[in-house]
Amino acid sequence: NSQPMRILYLRSPESRERLRPSLSATNLDKTMKAPLVALVAYDTQFWEHLPRMFHNPAAITWFKDKGAHTEITAFRNATLQGGYYLLALRAVGLDCGAMSGFDLAKADAAFFPDGRLKSNFLVNIGYGTGKGIVPRNPRLGFEETCRFL
């Protein structure tokens, strides 16, 4: 209900150049060449919008001036929103490569200098060719990651 996710679309070459210093070496080339890059961020003051979206007048007090609680909530809920965003992109036929391999502090300084928004992850968006896709790395099995009580 808090809807803290914000997306900054980096379309122009100039915006990509601003992002370049924050990219890891392994993500540099593919990000600079992607048709569109989404910088998925979260609003640390998302609570300001709660009166419009949440039918409990006290909701704003749950997060205003609550420090780490507000930050963790914004990050967690924006990450959940980001997962659904990826599903939506794929549902309309787009290929997307989500990545966390970048320097968040550098990206924040370049795009969100006032500190209200904070970077979460990047998504390269476009129509892939299938070239250069490496086999998926092994994954932990269900038995290793889940249990029932």
Q: What would you call each of these model-derived segments?
A:
Residues 55-57, 118-149:
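C-terminal helix-cap and adjacent tail motif
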Residues 18-20, 49-51, 133-136:
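Short, well-ordered secondary-structure micro-motifs
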Residues 2-5, 94, 120:
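Short secondary-structure junction motifs
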Residues 38, 57-110:
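Small-aliphatic-rich amphipathic alpha-helix that forms the alpha element of a beta-alpha
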Residues 1-47, 148-149:
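N-terminal amphipathic, basic helical "cap/leader" segment at the start of enzyme domains
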Residues 4-6, 52-56:
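Short Gly/aromatic-enriched secondary-structure transition segments
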Residues 28-33, 37-40, 113-134:
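A glycine-rich helix N-cap at a beta->alpha junction
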Residues 22, 52-53, 110:
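Residue-level signal for well-ordered alpha-helical positions
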